[in-house]
C-alpha cells in the first residue's frame, strides 16, 4: 500500500480476510485501502464488519470517523471519534480530528480540550496548534490565542492565516500598531489574502 500498488494490497487483504474470517484486523486494513481510493461506502461496510467482530477495535472507529469527515457528516464523525477514544486510542491525530469536527459542529468550547491535547501530544503539529489558537480567540482568551499563533508562525513562517488571525486578535486588544504589523506579514506572504487586505483597510483607511 505504501508503494501505491493498491491492486496487490487488495489481493493480500482479501486473502487475509478469507483466511481469518473472525479477525477484525484484515477488515480494517481493507477498509483503510478502500478509504484511500475514495470507495467510501464500501470502506464503511468493512469498518462495520470489523466492529461486529470486535467492538473495541479503536482503529475501525477512527477510520470510519475519517470517512464521515470526507462525506461532511460531522455528527456521525464525532460519534465515531468518541468511540475510538473510549476504546483506548490516544494519539494526537484523533484528538485533532475530534476537535476540528466539534468546530465544524459550532462547538468550539467543547473542541478546546481536544485541540489542546493534540498539541501536547504533537508539539510540531502546526495545524492543530492553529485550530487551538482559533478556538481560544473565539472564546475570548486573546493572550493565550496570540501565544499559539506566535508558535505557529515560528514553526511555519509562511502561515499567512496565523499572521492574519494574530492581526485580528491584536485589533480586538486595541493594539493598532501590532495588528497592522501582523496583517502586513500575512499580505507579504499572500498578496491576495482578501481577509487581511479588508481588515487592514478597516484599521488603516489611509
UniProtKB/Swiss-Prot annotation:
Repeat (TPR) residue spans along the chain: 1-23, 24-57, 59-91, 93-125, 127-159, 160-193
Keywords: Repeat, TPR repeat
Record-linked PROSITE patterns: TPR, TPR_REGION
Domain of life (superkingdom): Bacteria
Keyword Transmembrane helix included in the entry's annotation: no
Keyword Calcium in record: no
Pfam families: ANAPC3, TPR_19, TPR_8
InterPro entries: TPR-like_helical_dom_sf (IPR011990), TPR_rpt (IPR019734), Ycf3 (IPR050498)
Description of how the protein assembles with itself and partners: Monomer.
PANTHER family in the record: TETRATRICOPEPTIDE REPEAT PROTEIN 6, UDP-N-ACETYLGLUCOSAMINE--PEPTIDE N-ACETYLGLUCOSAMINYLTRANSFERASE SPINDLY-RELATED
Physiological role: Could be an interacting mediator in the complex formation among RNA sulfuration components, RNA processing components, and aminoacyl-tRNA synthetases.
Name this polypeptide is given: TPR repeat-containing protein YrrB
Natural source organism: Bacillus subtilis (strain 168)
